[in-house]
């Protein structure tokens, strides 16, 4: 079985990226990360990627960036794009070009709590469980088909920081 060539998009700390890197190193995940792309030049996840010998690319997303992004993507023959804490909505043109190859790691049990501030929303709603979803990316925000979910019981003293971890 050949290994998937993947690119991971991040914006921040890169804790999910580190989990992916660790699971690749243990051969649990049969893939290779060929690059990590971030819209934040100061993202700690870029340090994690560099420490693992993974190429890093910073793309300024303040203006129209789809052309720059497509040039970068065309340089790689990728099988999978993983959005791992990437805090920008991808342009429709990009989603169409890579449809079926883009997955997102979202910190809620979709279809509940789409978008931002999921941990706060879960606590405010007094949910019994919280978790994460991996889903295919479509033009609908956090609305693509769900691939897998993991859940955990919310304990009495849990707060946003605990749920994030």
Q: Predicted segments — roles?
A:
Residues 1-44:
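N-terminal Rossmann-like dinucleotide-binding module
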Residues 23, 84-165:
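Donor/substrate-binding cores of folate-linked one-carbon enzymes
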Residues 29-68:
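Short, surface-exposed acidic-centric catalytic microdomains
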Residues 55, 79, 128:
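Residue-level detector of anion-binding/catalytic polar loops
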Residues 34, 79, 100:
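Conserved acidic residues
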Residues 67-76:
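Short, well-structured alpha-helical segments in soluble
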Residues 38, 61-62, 76-92:
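N-terminal glycine-rich "phosphate-gripper" loop used for MgATP/nucleotide binding
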């Amino acid at each position: 079985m050949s290994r998937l060539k993947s690119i991971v998009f991040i914006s921040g700390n890169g804790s999910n990226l580190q989990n992916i890197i660790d699971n690749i190193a243990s051969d649990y995940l049969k893939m290779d990360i060929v690059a990590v792309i971030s819209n934040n030049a100061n993202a700690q996840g870029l340090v994690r990627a560099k420490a693992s010998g993974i190429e890093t690319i910073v793309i300024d997303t303040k203006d129209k960036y789809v052309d720059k992004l497509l040039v970068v993507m065309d340089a790689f023959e990728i099988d999978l794009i993983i959005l791992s804490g990437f805090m920008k909505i991808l342009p429709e043109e990009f989603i169409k070009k890579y449809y079926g190859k883009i997955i997102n790691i979202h910190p809620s049990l979709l279809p509940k709590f789409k978008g931002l501030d999921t941990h706060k929303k879960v606590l405010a709603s007094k949910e019994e469980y919280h978790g994460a979803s991996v889903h295919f990316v479509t033009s609908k925000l956090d609305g693509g088909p769900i691939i897998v979910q993991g859940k955990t019981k919310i304990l009495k003293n849990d707060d946003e920081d605990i749920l994030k971890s």
